[in-house]
Amino acid sequence: MKKTSLFFVSVLLMAFVATAQAQQFDAALGFGTVKAPAASNNGTNSFPSLSGGLYTTFSGDILFWHHLGFGGEVSPRWSQSTYGGVVNNFGIVQKYRPIFYDFNAVYGRNFQKKFGADVMAGIGGEDLRFYQPVYTCNLTCTNYVSSNHFAGHIGADLRFYFWGHAFIRPEAHYYIVHNNQEFNNVNPSRFTISIGYSFMPGF
């Protein structure tokens, strides 16, 4: 996935800078799910729910000054889901995959030796990929059509350091998605548990 590859490159760049001059750099891999209102029908159109599914999250953040910094994350759904009972132009049930991504200002603190916490706010997007049984080729070949929506994002987490600088981190995220007409609600929540490592001076 292009967004995932771009995010990995960004994380590597942040890690390089962090080891040189930052207070702290965190990198993590997480698994979680999305919660949103149930599907609805207004008599004319049916609106599926975004709830459910396993999401993989790749995240990184870097703190520079007075516990302030920036970070980013990308969260694709692990498997394709069925878009309600909609049948596409090829006569088969429509499959789709959501991808959430965001870039944030971050405030993070460590408490004693075992705990830390972060709060964040920023912008990002929701990339909805609707899959087709054939590939379309331009500069690259893909078998999906994307519907992209701008999103605001807020989130918070709690880090527990279980071994040195390695941590487990429960997280909660809230997205305000603009013009998310494909689904029943524009504001899904994402809940994740991540495992990661904090790179600090002297690690």
Show where each model-derived region lies.
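Short catalytic helix/loop segments, enriched in acidic residues and glycine
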Residues: 48-57
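Polyanion-binding surface elements
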Residues: 157
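Short glycine/proline-enriched turn or capping motifs at secondary-structure junctions
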Residues: 4-6, 183-195
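Gram-negative (and chloroplast) outer-membrane scaffold detector with strong preference
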Residues: 31-37, 56-139, 149, 160-162, ...
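Cleavable N-terminal export/targeting peptides
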Residues: 1-24, 202-203
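Extracellular loop and loop/strand-boundary signature of outer-membrane beta-barrel proteins
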Residues: 41-47, 86-94, 137-144, 179-184
